[in-house]
UniProtKB/Swiss-Prot annotation:
It comes from the Eukaryota. It is found in: Cytoplasm, Cytosol; Nucleus. GO terms for biological process: embryo development ending in seed dormancy; inositol biosynthetic process; myo-inositol hexakisphosphate biosynthetic process; phosphatidylserine biosynthetic process; post-embryonic development. Belongs to the myo-inositol 1-phosphate synthase family. It comes from Arabidopsis thaliana. This is Inositol-3-phosphate synthase isozyme 1.
Length: 511
């Protein structure tokens, strides 16, 4: 049975006019290596319970979202999709009359189990757990190195049906991105022809320009909060150098002296941290150099990333988790992609492809490390990623994977998968989820037993990891890539905010 909304009734939960307060018992285990009476050592697992207090501000703000790369395929597709939903637009395809929807969005189109009623499991919308911004109410803006208006950008992208594009054109033809930061050293040379709309000046002047843009956007649109997200070109990796970008002070001094190795994406992130605005990196480059992470932590400003997890990598994080969890040993993973959009064109340059290769290749590491029966220390499957640019297929990316595994008694198993990923139609709802969850997380505070004051989540937002290929985590924190674990973490934290136990799937009431 599906219900639209619910309210938790519990002595551990209190609803006020502006907040939800919950007291939550977090049950976990501590593992220690202890010496026994006979002098040997053994592993001891100790269950423990930690009491947490959560409070969530339920006053939903008017949200502004600024996209870096607003005129790209992702930016134009997302903006078009939100307008279509807000205006209730329908359009004719060769199959049917299609209604606008938010399919592909975790927050808007997925459900959670809340319990059982008369022997039947009860489900509710994911977004019913906590008050979230309605995507129809989001105000979009942003930057692009091309001055093309969003109606023409939508047509150039060739993502949406023509009938829909015609209906959306009046809403989008007057939306023109602000000029963006352009540095040809960080992206493919073939992007130069688009760059007719750029911010001039030194890196310090560019940061100041972005800050001015954000302030004016917030004032003009009368929004309460702004979230900035990078959905522009993949950059090459920045060199991390002691004395240049390893600390907040060194990074800011490097900006002041116009250091060439500070990338455009890092400049946007610096501007956001200085303004207290959450910044999310949707591409695979190392935007968050150590100095930027240091800066975000010290200023307590949310940062999240890296790289949208939309198609092939999402499947990989599910399939490898299944194989390793089933006691099957993946020994070779070969992933081939070809695509024809501007992302593919930019990735045809070796230096930008390397950024993508790293983010796509590391996705299986934690799953391999979890099973010492299958894998010796340091052992890892052969893992190859190939991306080629084929203009004809446009935004309809093809992903082909071959998984070879060892099975019982020396046998071999091979799984071959073909995945046609409509790149921007998969990425757009992920962008939406990232900005909505980033905003929500800024309204949640908590404290553990013994802590005197409530505080926010760590500025490095692991809560967003379900949506990213290479999750950014605080120093010393394990990286989790298995998709089911990432979703469970996000859902269970939100459940804790309303005093609900984690969904453990034991269903003891029916045993």
């Amino acid at each position: 049975m599906f219900i639209e909304s619910f309210k938790v009734e519990s002595p551990n939960v209190k609803y006020t006019e502006n907040e939800i307060h919950s007291v939550y018992d977090y049950e976990t285990t501590e593992v220690v290596h202890e010496k026994t009476v006979n002098g040997t050592y053994q592993w001891i697992v100790k269950p423990k319970t930690v009491k947490y207090d959560f409070k969530t501000d339920i006053r939903v703000p008017k949200l502004g979202v600024m996209l870096v790369g607003l005129g790209g395929n992702n930016g134009s597709t997302l903006t078009a999709g939100v307008i279509a939903n807000k205006e209730g637009i329908s359009w004719a395809t060769k199959d049917k009359v299609q209604q606008a929807n938010y399919f592909g969005s975790l927050t808007q189109a997925s459900s959670i189990r809340v319990g059982s009623f008369n022997g039947e499991e009860i489900y509710a919308p994911f977004k019913s757990l906590l008050p979230m911004v309605n995507p129809d109410d989001v105000v979009f803006g942003g930057w692009d190195i091309s001055d093309m208006n969003l109606a023409d950008a939508m047509a150039r992208a060739r993502v949406l049906d023509i009938d829909l594009q015609k209906q959306l054109r009046p809403y989008m033809e007057n939306i023109v991105p602000l000029p963006g930061i352009f540095d040809p050293d960080f992206i493919a040379a073939n992007q130069g022809s688009r760059a007719n709309h750029v911010i001039k000046g030194t890196k310090k002047e560019q940061v100041d320009h972005i800050i001015k843009d954000m302030r004016e956007f917030k004032e003009k649109n009368k929004v309460d909060k702004v979230v900035v997200l990078w959905t522009a070109n993949t950059e090459r990796y920045s060199n991390v150098v002691v004395g240049m970008n390893d600390t907040m002070e060194n990074l800011m001094e490097s900006v002041d002296r116009d250091e060439a190795e500070i990338s455009p994406s890092t400049l946007y992130a610096i501007a956001c941290v200085l303004e207290g605005i959450p910044f999310i990196n949707g591409s695979p480059q190392n935007t968050f150099v150590p100095g930027l992470i240091d800066m975000a932590i010290r200023n307590n400003v949310l940062i999240g990333g890296d790289d949208f997890k939309s198609g092939q990598t999402k499947m990989k994080s599910v399939l490898v988790d299944f194989l390793v969890g089933a006691g099957i040993k993946p020994t070779s993973i070969v992933s081939y992609n070809h695509l024809g959009n501007n992302d593919g064109m930019n990735l045809s340059a070796p230096q930008t492809f390397r950024s993508k290769e790293i983010s796509k290749s590391n996705v299986v590491d934690d799953m391999v490390a979890s099973n010492g029966i299958l894998f010796e220390p340091g052992e890892h499957p052969d893992h190859v990623v190939v991306i080629k640019y084929v203009p004809y297929v446009a935004d309809s990316k093809r992903a082909m994977d071959e998984y070879t595994s060892e099975i019982f008694m020396g046998g071999k198993n091979t799984i071959v998968m073909h995945n046609t990923c409509e790149d921007s139609l998969l990425a757009a709802p992920i962008i939406l989820d990232l900005v909505l969850l980033a905003e929500l997380s800024t309204r949640i505070q908590f404290k553990s037993e013994g802590e005197g004051k409530f505080h926010s989540f760590h500025p490095v937002a692991t809560i967003l990891s379900y949506l990213t290929k290479a999750p950014l985590v605080p120093p010393g924190t394990p990286v989790i890539n298995a998709l089911s674990k990432q979703r469970a973490m996000l859902e269970n934290i939100m459940r804790a905010c309303v005093g609900l136990a984690p969904e453990n799937n034991m269903i003891m009431e029916f045993k």
